[in-house]
Structure formats: C-alpha cells, structure tokens
Amino acid sequence: MSQLKLEKHSSRKRSILLIIKLLIILVSVLGCAKNETYRDNIVPDISVNNIKLSDTTSVVLGYSDLKYNVIEGKEELPYVIFTNENKTEILKLYLFYGAKRNEFYQAEISPYDKKTISNPTKYKNFSTESGIKLGISKKDLIKIKGNIFVETNHVLRYEISDYEKSHFLEKYNMPIYFAEYTFDQDKLCKIHFGFEYP
C-alpha cells in the first residue's frame, strides 16, 4: 500500500512540475509577443516626399507646371512619371479626368525600368510620410500600417470605404481610399495608394 501511495505522490509531483513548466513557457511566449506591437487600424498615407495627393499647391521638386508631362493611356488614368536622383526608383502620379492642374489622386512607387521615359528629380528615394519605401519587409510594413488588410498573391491591400463613418474620406470627398503593397521574397517592390476613381 505504501508503494501505491508513493507512486501516486510521484505521479502527482510530475504532473505539478509539468504544469509549472508549461506555465513558464506560456509566460515567456506571451512576454515575447508583447514586444511585437501591431496597429489594428489603418493610418492612410497621403503624400510621397511631401507631394500631397489632392493638393494643387504641392509640387514636385523642380517642376511647377506638369501639364506638358502628362501621359494619357487607354487602359489607365492620365499620369506623370518621375525618377529619383540615382534612377533606381519610379514615382507615378495619377490624375483624375476633370481634376485641376497638378492635382494628383494616386501615387505609385516601383523600381526603375530603363524603357520608361520619365522626368528626373533630385529626390534620393521616394517614401511616404509614414516611412514606407521600397525594400522594407512585410513584417515592418504591418508594424507601420496595421494588420487589417487583405492579402492576395503577395499583395497586401488596405482600404477605407465607409464614407458615412470616415472623416478622412469626407475631408477629401472621395468614396474609397486604398493602399496596395506588393512583395517579392519578403521585400516591398511596389507601392500604390490613393483614392479610387469615382
């Protein structure tokens, strides 16, 4: 009988030790997770290198009037295209039909393509006001922009579409704001954000 008591006591002791070990592991995992903070809402970007969307007074460094630089295609909105100083990046600024001169509603940053005819700038690189630029990791982007996105084929899409509840959309009088971030091998290779054409 005393042998049975010893076995029960030993079994109970092992169970308690196992529970304590599991609690220690759980606490350490939760402690590590606290260091990773993510936003649960989107803070929209509205500018690239201080070139603000929907602002006719915001001009591209070195260009005061872009009406002669506008490219009109059949498949997309009219746009103006720029390169950074080292010709490693492209900035495409899209205009809406009927918009005022130099009034852009979408911005797209991508790697330089030698086939592209573009306007040179003095900017070292292109980045948004929240610090988003080509080459950052998906993890870093999510830390900055938040975790409320839809991911499809290596593209993270953030969207604000509730006009009735969004002071941001109301301010710009636009129905939908979007931001799309394309990744290749966990590196950001394309940024496209702005307002959808109504």
Which residue ranges define each predicted feature?
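C-terminal motif of bacterial Sec signal peptides marking the signal peptidase cleavage site
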Residues: 29-31
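Bacterial signal peptide processing site
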Residues: 33-35
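A structural motif
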Residues: 105-120
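A cross-family detector of function-defining hotspots
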Residues: 55-109, 136-187, 193-198
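N-terminal secretory signal peptides that target proteins for export/translocation
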Residues: 1-15
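Sec-dependent signal peptide recognition
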Residues: 15-25
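Second-shell loop/turn segments in exported
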Residues: 46, 125-132
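Post-signal peptide N-terminal segment of mature Sec-exported envelope proteins
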Residues: 40-58
